[in-house]
Curated annotation (Swiss-Prot):
GO terms for biological process: gluconeogenesis; glyceraldehyde-3-phosphate biosynthetic process; glycerol catabolic process; glycolytic process. Belongs to the triosephosphate isomerase family. The gene is tpiA. Disulfide bonds: none annotated. InterPro entries: Aldolase_TIM, TIM_sf, TrioseP_Isoase_bac/euk, Triosephosphate_isomerase, Triosephosphate_isomerase_AS. This is Triosephosphate isomerase. The keyword Isomerase applies. It comes from Mycoplasmopsis pulmonis (strain UAB CTIP) (Mycoplasma pulmonis). The active site is at 101 (electrophile), 170 (proton acceptor). Transmembrane segments: none annotated. It is found in: Cytoplasm.
Amino acid sequence: MKKLLIIGNWKMNKTYDEARDFINAFSNAYALNGAKISENIEYGIAPSFTNMSLFNKELLEKTNINLVAQNINENRSGAFTGEISAQMLKSINAKYVIVGHSERRQNYRETNKIVNQKAKAAIENGLIPIICVGESLEEYEAGKTKAVIKKQIKQSLEALDLSKIVVAYEPIWAIGTGKVATAEVAQQICKFIRSITSKDLIIQYGGSVSPSNIENLMKQEDIDGALVGGASLEVDSFFELITFNALK
């Protein structure tokens, strides 16, 4: 049975009190039903920076949840107002960090080169970067998906140790839209990514993943997990995601 990595990306959601309520509810759910989580499932949450302190070492150990960051700065330290370094994240027990999310690429003009620099900074500080790639609706409809993905992969993963990273395929047209690539389409692109990288690379799919479609997506040979947005904001739906393959 292959290992699966399921990460919830909260984006800019939840106040401190709301995040604390989620954690309390998740801890209770884990105490009652944690045994339903298969040993092949690794899972985590990427909260906002203001809520990361709630995911303390005791919680991480008690519930086996991983702390994930939504972004980092590529520099180690210095005069970079408002930024967070990989070293800082490592010091609070973060394990993964998302880099190159399409919202960062589009809204903050992050290039493949910047994504590559951030991934290198993560690896150098003992974090595992989850490097996002994906095409726009216009590129998808024009049949340019593979060309776009290939360029992103080549430049974003340049000189990286592929055994120390995760790649998340997130078609931009499926993020937060309710639209989802069919499992077959997602598999086709993830298989393509594997063909131009490594057979052992961990590849996630992201884009409107929900409890209703995760099982079919995770059945695909070249999909090794999910990067989840909205469905990770509620304890019930997140718990459904990480127990989708529990014995019925």
